């Protein structure tokens, strides 16, 4: 598949994700669901940064492994925050269940597109 088709496909799916989030805000006249997107957008950053700064490929080096583990932990905590925030908002009464569901699905789609883009277009350096 050509790169142009990948970009067009990913951008159309990304537009659907943002549309769901915007609709969850606009239909119910409450803009709190827009805050739910922030953890989903920030979620890939810890893995990208820790992989970039982890330079050693020696499996015996513990420092780089700790850095990668910290990145994975931060990634997991951010994703859990993205799903827990709407639940908290619903329990407090800030948003409705439908708005929380739409914003979670939209945020998940946005996160999926960011992850797929990084997998498809980031060049992996191979050392021999």
Swiss-Prot record:
Q: Pfam families attached here?
A: Vps55
Keyword Ribonucleoprotein part of the UniProt annotation:
no
Protein transport: is it a keyword of this entry? yes
Q: Name one GO cellular component term.
A: fungal-type vacuole membrane
The protein's name in its UniProt record: Vacuolar protein sorting-associated protein 55
What is the protein's major site of localization?
Answer: membrane
All ranges on the Lumenal side of the membrane: 28-29, 96-98
Q: Which family does it belong to?
A: Belongs to the OB-RGRP/VPS55 family.
Q: Which residues lie on this side of the membrane: Cytoplasmic?
A: 1-6, 51-72, 122-128
Q: Which residues cross the membrane?
A: 7-27, 30-50, 73-95, 99-121
Highest taxon of the lineage: Eukaryota
Subcellular localization: Endosome membrane; Golgi apparatus membrane
Task of the protein = Involved in protein transport from endosomes to the vacuole.
What is the topology of this protein in the membrane according to its UniProt annotation?
Multi-pass membrane protein
Which keywords are on file for this protein? Endosome, Golgi apparatus, Membrane, Protein transport, Transmembrane, Transmembrane helix, Transport
One biological process term from GO is: late endosome to vacuole transport via multivesicular body sorting pathway
């Amino acid at each position: 598949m050509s790169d142009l088709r990948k970009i067009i496909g990913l951008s159309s799916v990304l537009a659907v994700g943002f549309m769901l989030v915007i609709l969850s805000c606009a239909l119910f006249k409450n803009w709190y669901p827009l805050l739910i997107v922030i953890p989903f957008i920030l979620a890939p950053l810890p893995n990208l940064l820790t992989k970039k700064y982890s330079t050693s490929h020696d499996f015996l080096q513990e420092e780089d492994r700790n850095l990668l583990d910290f990145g994975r932990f931060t990634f997991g905590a951010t994703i859990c925050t993205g799903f827990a925030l709407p639940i908290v908002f619903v329990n407090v009464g800030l948003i409705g269940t439908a708005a929380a569901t739409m914003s979670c699905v939209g945020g998940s789609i946005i996160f999926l597109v960011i992850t797929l883009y990084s997998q498809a277009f980031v060049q992996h350096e191979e050392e021999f």
